[in-house]
Amino acid sequence: MHHHPITLLSLLLGAAQSIAAHPTAHDERRSSSSIGVSASVPDDAALPVLHPFVSFSIEFAFFPDFAGNLSHPNLFSNQLLDNLADLQGAKPYIRVGGNTQDFALYDPKLRAATNATYITSISTDYPLILSFGPAFFESYFTWPGTKFIHGFNLGKNSSSDIELMLESVPLACKALEGGKLAYWELGNEPDLYKTSAQGIRRPASWTEQDYVDEWLNKTARIEKRLVEACPELAESKYIAPSFAGVTNSLNPVVTWEKGLDKSRNIALNSEHNYIGGATQPGVTLQNTLMNHTKTVESVAQQVNVSRILSKDNLTPGIPYILGETNSLYNEGAPGLSNSFGAALWGVDFNLYCASQNIRRTHMHQGSNYNYISWQPVGTNRTTIGTKAPYYGNAMVAAMLHGGDDVRIVNLPLAADTEAAYAAYVNETLVRVAVINLVEFNYTSTDSTAEKVESRPSAKYTFQLPSSESVYAGSVSVQRLMANGSNAITGITWDGWSYNYELAQGKPVRLQNVTTGEAISVGDDGVVEIEIPYSSAAILSL
């Protein structure tokens, strides 16, 4: 499925006027506002996103669930990745890592892919004792055309554990030969090693300099193994430092100042971000996830670090990405992270990141997690299937279609509960996205007519750029829809369902959803669109 053709391109050539959007609503409590958007890329716009932008991080212990193996490849997962490739133009990059990356020890005699032991008093979500064998690397052969980031263990630090990590290098590099390797990673969230509830990994005296020295030493030892086993990958690079946040026990700016990139082997500056915690007091759908201001505040911490690093020339030519991110840390909260409201949050969060020079995002996944985009296998806790957040991934991918020169610009709106963005491809405006974040819940006892009747909508008015050309008659519309923000099923992007039950993740056009929608443009270039509460849309020019 590809984006709609650009039908107003002639309007944009040489256009000098702005777009003005005036959101109004049936609900008179909401104030109207107006904004302007230039037809060409604003001077202060972010850099183009990396291609692909929409990417994933998969918990190390659960990678075999998501990808399968040579005899049983996970075709469902691969189909969902292919769908996103069709939308954004490139298959998502996959980072294999997370907390269990730093628990995982290589066992050359293990016949299974993994051997996992849960310590339920600490975490029921993932194993704290984990070994992986040669069969683990079969999972790198099941998703054609996918590039991977493989995570090595930095957390375990005895001489025998380090040797086991190094013994795994030849298997990893041979599995990722032939264009499958994107980057390596060494360590997950080392800024929590001194404080983690899952176990203390380093003494309180461990500093940024200690971390940098250790990272440089171990990556040099990894490089020696690469030279021996996979010489063509000897100069492959890393994402780093993979900190949990920017305000923990290691300071990311100091870490770069201490020479993290002394070996010139870091391709991307990777940090992690979560809006809040699954069990934090006061976390709600409306105030935490469906809240544009909260998203802006969360991303602002990353942007501040990014600007300092840039100003001090500490990361020249090294893009800033989120190598792991999602809604609520500790695997998300049921009823929040798995709802359609979380899908809308994902659209807002990802597009806002793209507008702030965060060049790629890897949404974190793990079997049975609440915030996952899909559950790859059936378990006694979760059924196999496409989950609500995936549909948000699809809309973001569609908004970012266009190759290597796609830029996103935030269009500030008045309320916490709405957001809008413009997409520019090759310097030209091609799409506008509008997200309504007013929480609208529904109950299964409502009839379909009652649901439609009772659901308010907001009206957004755009003034399209003008030129001497004649205005095209209409713009095309694609909508992200569900019955309400609390829905966990029945979700569509542009009328497509990606449900496992319908066609194992292949796109299926539902007949009860309006598609092919076009909105007429007035002679004066004004176009109006109604966005039901708790929904979103893309207008393609």
UniProtKB/Swiss-Prot annotation:
Post-translational modifications reported in the UniProt record: N-glycosylated.
GO CC, alphabetical: extracellular region
Activity-pH dependence: Optimum pH is 3.0-4.0.
Organism domain of life: Eukaryota
Primary localisation category: secreted
Membership in a protein family: Belongs to the glycosyl hydrolase 79 family.
Residues carrying a glycan: N69, N115, N157, N217, N291, N304, N380, N426, N441, N483, N512
Temperature dependence: Optimum temperature is 45 degrees Celsius.
Active-site annotation: E208 (proton donor), E324 (nucleophile)
GO MF annotations, alphabetized: beta-glucuronidase activity
Reactions catalysed according to its record: a beta-D-glucuronoside + H2O = D-glucuronate + an alcohol
The protein's Enzyme Commission number: 3.2.1.31
Pfam families, per the entry: Glyco_hydro_79C
Matching InterPro entries: GH79_Enzymes, GlcAase_C, Glycoside_hydrolase_SF
Protein's name in the database: Beta-glucuronidase
